[in-house]
């Protein structure tokens, strides 16, 4: 019985130490998600207005450009998947990967060859384990992405969209990331970045019936779109990176809170078992003492007779 009590005490100490770690990780994630939320709020208006500017230019000109012109028969698409470098975030990475795989299957059914680009070690590990081809990968900055990181990710994608498909280019650019809705809700979504669907953009921004201004372009609308293309792709990827970072921190906070709560419940259960074992040990000792005293009394009574 004493050995069993020692086992319970050892497990209580172990779970208590784990609880301290998960509580600390929960608090760290909570502080990081607040910072990430602020960055998302700061970057979203810029991305929205830049998209609106591209829409205005595309609507006001008849120029054929990768930003606004769809291929007659698209044959190749690039998919950018955003995951995290670290785990301990519940279903955060698996949901994004699942959404990317569903998008890839749909594009392939429609006759497109898919080139996959991945941000985050978790997504890369998933694809490498299954021996799936990855054109390019990026890692090391998913917790706190910067605009420079977004530019690094965007560079090969912009190069691919500007190339002809016969030279290894793509007709479409899609992105899969986790949208931050609230502290309790994060949703894996896929979005087509290029070519830009002018009607969808107007509907999303609530400007469907808005009359966009007419512009005179110097030197030309094509040159303006050439200048806007990298800015547009970089800003959208940067916003998606920030959304994914905020979602990852929120998922980590939720997972660590659940782990902390479970550790507390396990400690309570082990404490009850330890108390029961201690009580049983005390009861057994009392029974042995009483039994010994009774036997001694009987022996003394026999000797007196």
From Swiss-Prot:
Disulfide bonds: none annotated. InterPro entries: ATP_synth_F1_ATPase_gsu, ATP_synth_F1_gsu, ATP_synth_F1_gsu_CS. One of its GO terms (biological process) is proton motive force-driven ATP synthesis. GO terms for cellular component: plasma membrane; proton-transporting ATP synthase complex. Transmembrane segments: none annotated. GO terms for molecular function: ATP binding; proton-transporting ATP synthase activity, rotational mechanism. Keywords: ATP synthesis, Cell membrane, CF(1), Hydrogen ion transport, Ion transport, Membrane, Transport. It is found in: Cell membrane. It is a peripheral membrane protein. F-type ATPases have 2 components, CF(1) - the catalytic core - and CF(0) - the membrane proton channel. CF(1) has five subunits: alpha(3), beta(3), gamma(1), delta(1), epsilon(1). CF(0) has three main subunits: a, b and c. Belongs to the ATPase gamma chain family. Produces ATP from ADP in the presence of a proton gradient across the membrane. The gamma chain is believed to be important in regulating ATPase activity and the flow of protons through the CF(0) complex. This is ATP synthase gamma chain. It comes from Streptomyces coelicolor (strain ATCC BAA-471 / A3(2) / M145). The lineage of its organism: Bacteria, Bacillati, Actinomycetota, Actinomycetes, Kitasatosporales. The gene is atpG.
């Amino acid at each position: 019985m004493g050995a069993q009590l020692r086992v319970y005490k050892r497990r209580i100490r172990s779970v208590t130490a784990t609880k301290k770690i998960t509580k600390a990780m929960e608090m760290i994630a909570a502080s990081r998600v607040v910072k990430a939320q602020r960055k998302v709020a700061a970057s979203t208006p810029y991305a929205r207005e830049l998209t609106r500017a591209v829409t205005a230019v595309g609507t006001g000109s008849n120029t054929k450009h990768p930003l606004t012109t769809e291929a007659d028969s698209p044959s190749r698409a690039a998919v950018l998947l955003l995951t995290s470098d670290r785990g301990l975030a519940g279903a955060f990475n698996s949901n994004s990967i699942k959404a990317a795989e569903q998008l890839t299957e749909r594009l392939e059914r429609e006759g497109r060859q898919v080139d996959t680009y991945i941000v985050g070690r978790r997504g890369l590990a998933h694809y490498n384990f299954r021996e799936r081809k990855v054109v390019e990968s990026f890692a090391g900055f998913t917790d706190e992405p910067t605009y420079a990181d977004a530019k690094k990710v965007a560079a090969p994608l912009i190069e691919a969209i500007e190339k002809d498909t016969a030279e290894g280019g793509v007709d479409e650019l899609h992105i899969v990331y986790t949208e931050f809705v609230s502290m309790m809700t994060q949703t894996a979504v896929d979005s087509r970045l290029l070519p830009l669907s002018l009607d969808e953009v107007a509907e999303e921004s609530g400007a469907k019936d808005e009359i966009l201004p007419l512009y005179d372009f110097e030197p030309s609308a094509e040159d303006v779109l050439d200048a806007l293309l990298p800015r547009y792709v970089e800003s959208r990827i940067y916003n998606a990176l920030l959304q994914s970072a905020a979602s990852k921190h929120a998922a980590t906070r939720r997972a660590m809170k659940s782990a902390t709560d479970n550790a507390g419940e396990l400690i309570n259960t082990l404490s009850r078992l330890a108390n029961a074992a201690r009580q049983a040990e005390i009861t057994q000792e009392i029974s042995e003492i009483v039994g010994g005293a009774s036997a001694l009394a009987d022996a003394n009574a026999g000797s007196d007779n």
